[in-house]
From Swiss-Prot:
<dbReference type="InterPro" id="IPR006197">
    <property type="entry name" value="Peptidase_S24_LexA"/>
</dbReference>
<keyword id="KW-0238">DNA-binding</keyword>
<keyword id="KW-0804">Transcription</keyword>
<dbReference type="GO" id="GO:0003677">
    <property type="term" value="F:DNA binding"/>
</dbReference>
<dbReference type="InterPro" id="IPR015927">
    <property type="entry name" value="Peptidase_S24_S26A/B/C"/>
</dbReference>
<dbReference type="InterPro" id="IPR036390">
    <property type="entry name" value="WH_DNA-bd_sf"/>
</dbReference>
<feature type="DNA-binding region" description="H-T-H motif">
    <location>
        <begin position="28"/>
        <end position="48"/>
    </location>
</feature>
<dbReference type="GO" id="GO:0006281">
    <property type="term" value="P:DNA repair"/>
</dbReference>
<dbReference type="GO" id="GO:0006260">
    <property type="term" value="P:DNA replication"/>
</dbReference>
<dbReference type="InterPro" id="IPR006200">
    <property type="entry name" value="LexA"/>
</dbReference>
<keyword id="KW-0234">DNA repair</keyword>
<comment type="similarity">
    <text>Belongs to the peptidase S24 family.</text>
</comment>
<dbReference type="GO" id="GO:0004252">
    <property type="term" value="F:serine-type endopeptidase activity"/>
</dbReference>
<keyword id="KW-0068">Autocatalytic cleavage</keyword>
<dbReference type="InterPro" id="IPR050077">
    <property type="entry name" value="LexA_repressor"/>
</dbReference>
<feature type="active site" description="For autocatalytic cleavage activity">
    <location>
        <position position="183"/>
    </location>
</feature>
<feature type="active site" description="For autocatalytic cleavage activity">
    <location>
        <position position="146"/>
    </location>
</feature>
Amino acid sequence: MEGLTDRQLEVLRFIASQIEDHGYPPTIREIGEALDIRSTNGVNDHLKALERKGYLSRDPVKSRALIPTSAAREALGGGETGSNVVPLVRGPARPGSRMIEIPIVGRVAAGMPILAQERVEDTVQVDAFLLGTNKKVYGLRVQGDSMIGDGILPGDYVFVKKQLNADDGEIVVAMIDDEATVKRVYFEGDRVRFQPSNPRMAPIYVRHSDFRSTMILGVVVGVYRKLT
């Protein structure tokens, strides 16, 4: 395995920290702004080098599909637990940390839509710093593999911020035909597209005239994996 330059290590460390803090990778523009890399081409050069050296897996057509490999986790001192998730079961709490309890209200499909049961099945305690300023957050357990391109795997928990609106391209939990599903949402003229990140899966389309804001149950602000 080839070694990393100081700059490549900075880029890799920033990607891993953003995934841990927010549950998803940064965009190329966010990397450039954070590390003072003036052009997107410059960022892309570093990403290509990280991919070529085996430290990063990426999809060139998706701005956030940046997943550190096991070699990256070793280089960053993360072992085998994975940098793209934050385990629900952690070691001792950070000094001065504040733990909050998140309700797990059911399950949601990352595949064919299924009904998310609106009752509290369990709760998990998470360090408050992981959720930042997000309030009114609830958890859902994921079934299906249509969001694996975003690092959301079957059995993971998604933490969802309750809101009835979303920006173009955000990962949302949506209620479609009385069934809940997790997808990226895109507003495209006369229709709304709910897009999986697994290339084997087809998107779900809703005509703009049929779309209601109440279809959006919330925006995914993190993905968490329970370690055994």
